[in-house]
Amino acid sequence: VVECFTSKKATPFSDTYATAGAKLIFHNIREAYGDADNMEAKNNMMLGAFYGGVAITGSGTTAVHALSYPLGKYHIAHGVSNAILFAHVMEFNKDACKERLAVLCDGVFPEFATKSVDEKADYMIGQIADIVKVTNIPTDLTEFGVKMEDLDFLVQAGSDQKRLLVNNMKELSLDDIREIYLKVLK
Protein backbone atom coordinates (compact mmCIF):
# COMPACT_ATOMS: atom_id res chain seq x y z
CA VAL A 1 0.00 0.00 0.00
CA VAL A 2 2.94 2.34 0.61
CA GLU A 3 4.23 1.43 -2.82
CA CYS A 4 0.86 2.36 -4.36
CA PHE A 5 0.84 5.69 -2.54
CA THR A 6 4.29 6.56 -3.91
CA SER A 7 3.59 5.50 -7.50
CA LYS A 8 3.65 8.10 -10.26
CA LYS A 9 0.21 6.76 -11.22
CA ALA A 10 -1.30 7.34 -7.76
CA THR A 11 -4.71 9.02 -7.85
CA PRO A 12 -7.08 10.29 -5.16
CA PHE A 13 -8.97 7.00 -5.57
CA SER A 14 -5.89 4.80 -5.08
CA ASP A 15 -4.66 7.08 -2.28
CA THR A 16 -7.91 6.60 -0.36
CA TYR A 17 -7.61 2.82 -0.44
CA ALA A 18 -3.84 2.83 0.09
CA THR A 19 -4.22 5.00 3.20
CA ALA A 20 -7.04 2.88 4.61
CA GLY A 21 -5.08 -0.30 3.90
CA ALA A 22 -1.86 1.07 5.37
CA LYS A 23 -3.63 2.16 8.53
CA LEU A 24 -5.09 -1.31 9.06
CA ILE A 25 -1.88 -3.12 8.20
CA PHE A 26 0.55 -0.98 10.21
CA HIS A 27 -1.71 -1.06 13.27
CA ASN A 28 -2.50 -4.79 13.17
CA ILE A 29 0.35 -6.77 11.62
CA ARG A 30 2.36 -7.19 14.81
CA GLU A 31 -0.66 -8.48 16.73
CA ALA A 32 -1.86 -10.68 13.86
CA TYR A 33 1.60 -12.23 13.54
CA GLY A 34 2.33 -12.54 17.25
CA ASP A 35 -1.03 -13.82 18.49
CA ALA A 36 -2.55 -16.67 16.50
CA ASP A 37 -5.86 -16.22 18.33
CA ASN A 38 -6.28 -12.50 17.63
CA MET A 39 -9.03 -12.72 15.03
CA GLU A 40 -9.73 -8.99 15.10
CA ALA A 41 -6.14 -8.21 14.06
CA LYS A 42 -6.24 -10.94 11.40
CA ASN A 43 -9.55 -9.66 10.02
CA ASN A 44 -8.12 -6.14 9.93
CA MET A 45 -5.10 -7.46 8.03
CA MET A 46 -7.39 -9.19 5.55
CA LEU A 47 -9.35 -5.98 5.00
CA GLY A 48 -6.10 -3.99 4.72
CA ALA A 49 -4.82 -6.42 2.09
CA PHE A 50 -8.09 -6.06 0.18
CA TYR A 51 -7.79 -2.27 0.25
CA GLY A 52 -4.21 -2.64 -0.95
CA GLY A 53 -5.41 -4.71 -3.88
CA VAL A 54 -7.94 -2.04 -4.80
CA ALA A 55 -5.20 0.62 -4.57
CA ILE A 56 -2.90 -1.39 -6.84
CA THR A 57 -5.56 -1.51 -9.57
CA GLY A 58 -5.51 2.29 -9.65
CA SER A 59 -1.85 3.08 -9.12
CA GLY A 60 0.11 0.04 -10.17
CA THR A 61 3.34 -0.91 -8.47
CA THR A 62 6.87 0.42 -8.73
CA ALA A 63 10.50 -0.60 -8.31
CA VAL A 64 9.75 -2.77 -5.27
CA HIS A 65 7.81 -5.20 -7.45
CA ALA A 66 10.13 -4.72 -10.45
CA LEU A 67 13.17 -5.81 -8.47
CA SER A 68 11.24 -8.60 -6.74
CA TYR A 69 10.18 -10.38 -9.92
CA PRO A 70 13.62 -11.84 -10.76
CA LEU A 71 13.73 -13.40 -7.29
CA GLY A 72 10.98 -15.81 -8.32
CA LYS A 73 13.73 -17.81 -10.03
CA TYR A 74 14.92 -18.74 -6.53
CA HIS A 75 11.44 -19.81 -5.39
CA ILE A 76 11.15 -16.89 -2.99
CA ALA A 77 7.51 -16.13 -2.25
CA HIS A 78 6.35 -12.93 -3.93
CA GLY A 79 5.40 -11.20 -0.68
CA VAL A 80 8.68 -12.18 0.95
CA SER A 81 10.77 -10.86 -1.94
CA ASN A 82 8.82 -7.58 -1.85
CA ALA A 83 9.34 -7.31 1.91
CA ILE A 84 13.09 -7.95 1.62
CA LEU A 85 13.52 -5.11 -0.87
CA PHE A 86 10.81 -2.72 0.30
CA ALA A 87 12.63 -0.48 2.80
CA HIS A 88 15.74 -0.35 0.61
CA VAL A 89 13.78 0.82 -2.43
CA MET A 90 11.86 3.35 -0.33
CA GLU A 91 15.14 4.66 1.10
CA PHE A 92 16.46 5.05 -2.47
CA ASN A 93 13.23 6.82 -3.48
CA LYS A 94 12.95 8.98 -0.38
CA ASP A 95 14.19 12.27 -1.80
CA ALA A 96 11.69 11.96 -4.68
CA CYS A 97 8.67 10.93 -2.60
CA LYS A 98 9.23 12.15 0.95
CA GLU A 99 6.27 14.51 0.73
CA ARG A 100 4.03 11.60 -0.28
CA LEU A 101 5.42 9.46 2.55
CA ALA A 102 4.72 12.33 4.95
CA VAL A 103 1.10 12.60 3.78
CA LEU A 104 0.68 8.86 4.23
CA CYS A 105 2.26 9.09 7.68
CA ASP A 106 -0.32 11.74 8.61
CA GLY A 107 -3.10 9.36 7.57
CA VAL A 108 -1.67 6.33 9.35
CA PHE A 109 0.10 7.85 12.35
CA PRO A 110 -1.67 11.16 13.15
CA GLU A 111 0.36 11.45 16.35
CA PHE A 112 3.29 12.49 14.10
CA ALA A 113 1.42 15.50 12.66
CA THR A 114 3.86 18.01 14.13
CA LYS A 115 6.98 16.25 12.82
CA SER A 116 8.88 17.43 9.75
CA VAL A 117 8.43 15.91 6.30
CA ASP A 118 11.81 14.19 6.60
CA GLU A 119 10.98 12.77 10.03
CA LYS A 120 7.67 11.41 8.76
CA ALA A 121 9.28 9.85 5.68
CA ASP A 122 12.00 8.27 7.81
CA TYR A 123 9.40 6.98 10.25
CA MET A 124 7.40 5.29 7.49
CA ILE A 125 10.50 3.62 6.06
CA GLY A 126 11.54 2.60 9.57
CA GLN A 127 8.13 1.05 10.18
CA ILE A 128 8.48 -1.01 7.00
CA ALA A 129 11.90 -2.27 8.11
CA ASP A 130 10.57 -2.99 11.60
CA ILE A 131 7.69 -5.08 10.27
CA VAL A 132 10.15 -7.19 8.28
CA LYS A 133 12.17 -7.72 11.46
CA VAL A 134 9.20 -8.43 13.74
CA THR A 135 7.72 -10.95 11.30
CA ASN A 136 11.07 -12.75 10.99
CA ILE A 137 11.40 -12.28 7.24
CA PRO A 138 14.99 -13.00 6.21
CA THR A 139 16.82 -9.92 4.99
CA ASP A 140 19.67 -11.70 3.21
CA LEU A 141 19.01 -13.25 -0.19
CA THR A 142 21.81 -15.75 0.37
CA GLU A 143 19.43 -17.51 2.78
CA PHE A 144 17.43 -18.44 -0.32
CA GLY A 145 20.40 -19.64 -2.34
CA VAL A 146 21.02 -16.39 -4.21
CA LYS A 147 24.75 -15.93 -4.78
CA MET A 148 26.88 -12.91 -5.49
CA GLU A 149 27.54 -14.32 -8.97
CA ASP A 150 23.77 -13.97 -9.62
CA LEU A 151 24.00 -10.21 -9.23
CA ASP A 152 24.38 -9.40 -12.94
CA PHE A 153 21.33 -11.53 -13.77
CA LEU A 154 19.28 -9.80 -11.06
CA VAL A 155 20.29 -6.32 -12.20
CA GLN A 156 19.45 -7.04 -15.84
CA ALA A 157 16.21 -8.87 -15.08
CA GLY A 158 15.11 -6.14 -12.65
CA SER A 159 15.90 -3.40 -15.16
CA ASP A 160 13.82 -5.25 -17.77
CA GLN A 161 10.64 -4.62 -15.73
CA LYS A 162 10.06 -1.31 -17.52
CA ARG A 163 6.25 -1.31 -17.08
CA LEU A 164 6.81 -1.07 -13.31
CA LEU A 165 9.96 1.03 -13.25
CA VAL A 166 8.23 3.83 -15.17
CA ASN A 167 5.85 4.18 -12.19
CA ASN A 168 8.71 4.71 -9.75
CA MET A 169 9.09 8.28 -8.46
CA LYS A 170 12.83 8.17 -9.08
CA GLU A 171 14.56 6.73 -12.12
CA LEU A 172 16.87 3.81 -11.40
CA SER A 173 20.10 3.29 -13.30
CA LEU A 174 21.71 -0.14 -13.55
CA ASP A 175 24.14 0.99 -10.85
CA ASP A 176 21.24 2.02 -8.59
CA ILE A 177 19.61 -1.38 -9.04
CA ARG A 178 22.93 -3.09 -8.32
CA GLU A 179 23.34 -1.08 -5.10
CA ILE A 180 19.87 -2.04 -3.90
CA TYR A 181 20.51 -5.74 -4.53
CA LEU A 182 23.90 -5.49 -2.81
CA LYS A 183 22.12 -4.32 0.35
CA VAL A 184 20.30 -7.65 0.51
CA LEU A 185 23.15 -9.89 -0.66
CA LYS A 186 25.35 -10.12 2.42
Segment roles from a protein language model:
Residues F50-N82, K162-L164:
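Glycine-rich phosphate/pyrophosphate-binding beta-alpha loops
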Residues V1-V2, M45-G53, A83-F86, I128, ...:
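Short alpha-helical scaffolding segments that buttress acidic/His motifs in well-ordered protein cores
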Residues I76-D140:
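Active-site pocket-lining segment
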Residues V1-S59, M169:
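Carboxylate- and glycine-rich phosphate/diphosphate-binding segment that chelates Mg2+/Mn2+
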Residues F112-K186:
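C-terminal charged capping/lid subdomain of soluble metabolic enzymes
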Residues P12-K23, V80, D95-E99, D122, ...:
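Alpha-helix N-cap/helix-start motif at coil-to-helix transitions, marked by capping-box chemistry
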